[in-house]
Amino acid sequence: MSGLLTLAIGALFYSSGSIARPDLQPLGPNIADKGSAFYHFTQRQYDSADGERHYRVWTAVPDKTPPAAGYPVLYMLDGNAVMDKLDDAFLQQLFAGSPPVIVAIGYQTALPFDTAARAWDYTPPLKTHEPRAGKPALPPRKTGGNDVFRQLLTETMVPQTEANLKIDPHQRAIWGHSYGGLFVLDAWRKASLFGIYYSASPSLGQALQSPLQASQSLDAVRFRGKSLYLLEGDGKARGEPSGHEASLEVLRQTQQQLASKGLTVAFWRYPGLTHGQMFEVSLRSALLHLSGQAALAHQ
């Protein structure tokens, strides 16, 4: 790739790597508990090979005959928080199109996020950052386990989920936000099992090696039939470090450069939305888009 792209990617990954702290209030009943007029839900549980992490996976199947090619399917990280954001009015909206199977991959917790587990599961080796002035240092988390988690996902969770379902493998998609977005981006770079990748507000500044920088030598042939969507808001939350607007521009230029090399990559920019606000907006956009409908308004 061009020297301009190399410099642009480098600038993005040397930008400040602040991590937003998620809301960790216990969740109430979700749509699977309440029931839906449009989808039916099942659950499975899994344990990591080392016994350290424990997963709860919700599968939502439309009460509608699958298309001839099979249902689209969207695997969604941070599944506890995803399930908390779904309601029957939105599922009805999906039902009006070609509704996807929804697979929400969460953890065996009452909280929206298992911060320690996701820090390991969703990340490559990460940078460490000195705390900003006036901010307490966060306790260190174990990171760098994305290859291990991806193996569990693609070799166990996906085959078991799809065993008795008619799925269109070309419409097998994955979505993640923040650390989850970083996981999705790295999975795309490694041309994994999925055909469609939705990377929302990826925590790019945290990686020791940028997944995009590592993509400079990608062979476009390996990515034939694969699509990457980069979703980011341009709003700045209080206390967020400077440089976000420059990072957005770099991300846009990166998308253009990758697309010019024959890769199917799109950048969706959401005016005024902050990192945290992008969680719900991006998951709804991905589900709508996969159902054949227009994603929520973006540029």
Regions found by a protein language model. Name each.
Residues 69-152, 156, 160, 164:
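Serine-hydrolase catalytic machinery in alpha/beta-hydrolase-like enzymes
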Residues 181-191:
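Short glycine-enriched nucleophile-adjacent loop
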Residues 205-269, 273:
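The feature captures the conserved acid-bearing segment of alpha/beta-hydrolase catalytic domains
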Residues 273-280:
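Catalytic histidine-centered segment of alpha/beta-hydrolase-like enzymes
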Residues 166-177:
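Alpha/beta-hydrolase fold nucleophile elbow
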Residues 3-14:
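Bacterial N-terminal signal peptides
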Residues 193-204:
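A conserved short beta-strand
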Residues 17-71:
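A domain-start/cap signature at the N-terminus of enzymes
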